């Protein structure tokens, strides 16, 4: 199942399961997740952000690229990158 299809089914009861499914897609999900992070709100945005953090290092370069293109997105990208890089140390 694709990222968009999973996110369409998202609710409070299945968010953990769907997040796990998104993360299992790995780096192939990152471009769509970054686009969704910039356009979504609420529960979807939270699941997208956590998915990017859990995917980890494969998210970093595309987060940086998106931040360079969209100045309003910079703080979000910086936060997620810090979370990803901080989890490598732990």
Task: For each feature predicted by the language model, list its residue ranges.
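Core helices of alpha-solenoid repeat scaffolds
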Residues: 3, 29-30, 60
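A generic short-segment signal for beta-strand/edge and adjacent turn/coil regions
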Residues: 1-3, 16, 33
